[in-house]
Amino acid sequence: MSVILNEVRRATYLDSIILMRISRQIAALPGIEEAGLIIGTPANKEILRDAGILGSESDSAEPSDLILALRASDALAGEAALAEARRLIDHPSALGAAAAVESSRTMRAAIKRLPAANLALISVPGDFAVAEAHKALELGLHAMIFSDNVPLDDEAALKRKARERGLFVMGPDCGTAIIGGVPLGFANVVPQGDIGIIGASGTGIQEVSCLIARAGRGITHALGTGGRDLKAEVGAITTLMAIDALDADDHTKHIVLISKPPAASVARLVLDRVAKSAKPFTICFLGASDVALPANARAAATLKATADIVVGGSAASWAQQPLPGLGRGGLVRGLFAGGTLCSEAQIIFRQAGLAVMSNVPVPGASAIGRAQDGKVLTDHVMIDLGDDEFTRGRPHPMFEPGVRDGPLAEALADPSVGIILLDIVLGYGGHPDPAGHLAAFLDGREHRPLIVASVTGTDADPQPRNAQVEALAAAGVIVADSNAEATEAAIAALGPSLDRA
């Protein structure tokens, strides 16, 4: 019978990235069914309670405390896992070189150690991120806020304060940026060039920058804004500042803007600013339609189309290419680590006239809960496994590809599923071998649906893309050059006899 074990470490703080890495290692230990290392805020305790691993001893945990929570197959496995967690918390350098950096107790102390620094990357629980961002701004630092769960009013106030000081606030929930060739957060190794990217989406920036790189071009900067910057309450403060910066940069010749559809009033602000530039823009408002753009801007419906416009190329459609299993029918089940890649797939399904459901639906798609209350699914389904409902108390699937194992096993066993659509996202911050994990999971599983995947990354990444593609191909996975082409391949494999919505 499973046992629940908790331990509270008083007045203990570790960076959220380190906590996720420790969680991943503990969850992989023998006999561990679920594991979470998390700061003891009320919201985080609720996450652990929902996951079924919060013990009564953790009820008294404060926001300054660290909770170790796990479910194990037996007490012996649980105690061994707790001991390993204690060791890694006390000696985070054991995680590897990335964790073995000198640390400072305060931001002021860090500035004394590195006085030339001009940017703070903030990765603390949302309850503390606002205060740390204010400290950064007051010290004259730009702020990239990796943290989420920051109130919208606080985000707007931070960005107004930054604008007054001539500083950037990227985020909250900004997972990706590349500044002068230096990747921050989840980002890929791409060459420098003359294309600037502004993105409200981390995986959107990653996909477009990698497609540009694989076409032989490069970027100047990729500036993340956070997913809510284009809401009316924030007013696109960071987006507008980023346009100003890239417009003034002599090395940037073409500017790309990627986001979900903005509020109408905010869209006018952004497009009015675009119109004042002498530079060409490519604008991808994912899921938007009939947006009137200024003369110097072109619209792109997908991330792939965005890259094609920028580099002046276009790949042949998978609808005209031979595929094994063509016309096999059934339903497509998409299981994505990247939220924007999930959105792009839905858009392509809707463009093809196909009904699609998702836990994060784009306009025209239907909403679905995680379990759909036991209802039989009769439409194609695209699931964002990085959404909060799947990551409460667990690592993000880009850290831990095992998050996809359960939903993938369900899809493999579902007789209504004919095709499975997957994304593999590489780069700094991600799992060291996501393709290897998937290949091992698929090993020995016969009579399975057709599996189509894309690999977002470059050959220069810590996990070289060419090696990841080879591992997937050896496992019998069809690998497309982009997420859009993988989606087109899945649709093509359905064959010509499709029910159109």
Where are these regions (language model features)?
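Catalytic-core regions of core metabolic enzymes
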Residues: S2-A501
